[in-house]
Structures are given as C-alpha cells and as structure tokens.
Amino acid sequence: MKAPIVILNFKTYLESSGEKALELSKALESVSYESGITMVAAPQTTDIFRINDETNIPIFAQHIDPVSPGGNTGSNLMEALIESGINGTLLNHSEQRMRLADIAEVIQRTKEQKITSVVCTNNIETSAAAATLNPEFVAVEPPELIGSGIPVSQAEPEIVEGTVNKVKEINKKIKVLCGAGIATGDDMKAAMDLGASGVLLASGIILSKNPKTALLDLVSKI
C-alpha cells in the first residue's frame, strides 16, 4: 500500500455510524482523489458492505478474531469480512487488546488471504515484538494520548522515532504509522519527519465540524 497513508478508525461514534459512515467514507475518497494520498476507512463491521459498494477506497476491519468458520457466535470472521469488502485489518488496538499468539495467528491468515495487517502497539518494546510477527504495518499509539488532542508526534517524539528505528532493525519492509492525538497538518508532518509512513487517527477528524475540511488540513503539509 502506497505511503503516505491515512487510516481513519471510525470506532463506534454515532458520527461515524450508518449513513454518516458512508458520508465520512465519501469524504475520505474525495480527499484521496484531490491529494493523491492513500486514505483508508476502518468502519464498524455493520457498515463495511455498503461502504465497499458505494466507494472505491480501501477498507480495513477494526478487528478480526482468530476463528475459523463454524460455531463462534459474536466473532469477527476473516472470510466474512473479506466477502463484505475489506482489504486489511487493524489488530490489537488499545480498545481491543489481543494475546500475542492470537495476533500471530491472524497475521498468518491475512498473508494467506492477501490482505493487509496493521498491529497497534503502545511503546517501542511492544512495537519490536509486533515487528517479529511480520505485519505490513505497526501503528504506535501511547494509550494515554488517544483521544486527548495531544499528538504523540509532538508530545513524545522519541517513541515514534524509536519505534521506527527498532522496527526497521527487525524488518525494513514494515512501515510504521503514528497514532494518538493526531488531528492537524502539523501533527502529520511531525510524524512523517520522525520517519513514520503515515497516521492512524479517529476523533480528531470524526468529531470535527467538517470532516472533509479537517482531512484536507491533515494532508496539507505533506
């Protein structure tokens, strides 16, 4: 997937659910077309099929469970999500933590299915551990900064830079994304200057008065 990349995690905000999820996805598609920057939607499972049907942007699941087809009530089945239209998935977000063995299993299955994996981490050490599993992306997000409006790229730049360096030592092909508190063009530029290949963000865009305007500002300095 071409860098720089912006992944918008829709989480479970009402502002990014149902009809508003589609509107947000169309804003991502429009800004991607105008800027030439890869924009990815990570909507709730219920909205994936419609967004895939009505837009041409990449779609990631917010989570996939390490289950096979069968009796797994309430689980997110990879095969069903692919059928609905995903191109990849987030894994181990701070709001949906996973065991290391489960992360490894899902990453292996994403490779078999040829979809992209993004493992979320919270510091340099866990980023290094994630890199040994060979996902396509590691997204570092100190949990105390998530939703805070304080960007990690400026509050704790050493975490971003240290993660980039450590991950590249393990596997140069893995790209690092910067998350937590990202909202503006200055935030994204700071992340890129520290070696990140893009950003993972949510509330800074979703809860803004005009998400498309906020997205345009986000990529304005790249």
Positions of predicted regions on the chain:
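Glycine-rich phosphate-binding active-site loops on the catalytic face of alpha/beta enzymes
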Residues: 87-98, 138-151, 194-214
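Catalytic cores of alpha/beta
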Residues: 122-134, 178-199
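Glycine-rich beta-to-alpha transition loops that act as phosphate-gripper elements at the mouths
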Residues: 63-66, 70-72, 99-101, 119-124, ...
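Conserved N-terminal beta1-alpha1 strand-loop-helix module at the mouth
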Residues: 1-76, 125-134, 206
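Conserved, mostly hydrophobic/aromatic
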Residues: 11, 44, 81, 141, ...
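Active-site rim beta-loop-alpha module in soluble metabolic enzymes
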Residues: 112-177
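Glycine/small-residue-rich loop that forms an oxyanion/phosphate-binding "nest" at active or ligand-binding sites
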Residues: 56-110
